[in-house]
Every structure is written in C-alpha cells, then in structure tokens.
From Swiss-Prot:
Belongs to the universal ribosomal protein uL29 family. HAMAP family: Ribosomal_uL29. It comes from Rhodospirillum centenum (strain ATCC 51521 / SW). One of its GO terms (molecular function) is structural constituent of ribosome. It comes from the Bacteria. This is Large ribosomal subunit protein uL29. GO terms for cellular component: cytosolic large ribosomal subunit. InterPro entries: Ribosomal_protein_uL29 (IPR050063), Ribosomal_uL29 (IPR001854), Ribosomal_uL29_CS (IPR018254), Ribosomal_uL29_sf (IPR036049). PANTHER family: 60S RIBOSOMAL PROTEIN L35/50S RIBOSOMAL PROTEIN L29 (PTHR10916), LARGE RIBOSOMAL SUBUNIT PROTEIN UL29C (PTHR10916:SF0).
Amino acid sequence: MTKATDIRTKSADELNEQLLQLKKEQFNLRFQRASGQLENTARVREVRRDIARIKTILGERTRSAQPAS
C-alpha cells in the first residue's frame, strides 16, 4: 500500500507510470479471481485504493494549476 505522502513527492510522469502498472496488475488480479487462482484477495482492494489515491492527487494538481475563474 502506498501512502499519500509518498505519492505527493513523485512527479506527474512517475505517477502516470505507476498508475499504468497498477491498472495492469488490477486487470491480472481480476482474471485470477474469475478463474479461482487468486490467493491474496486483499490485494484487489489495495490496488483499487492505490489507483484512487494516485488519481486524486493528480486531480488536485491539475485543479491547483488552473487559475480560478
């Protein structure tokens, strides 16, 4: 599990790369769960929440970069 403070120190490029890796892992976990091969079911939840954390921080950055109108 990645902490929000660790995510905030990374650049946008690093976050997008990590987001892509997490989405690939989520895809693989989904198939493992469907075929009954998934051993660590808690990892599905961790990955989903890590994706949400990264998307939230990226959204905060884009909103703060835009001037208020």
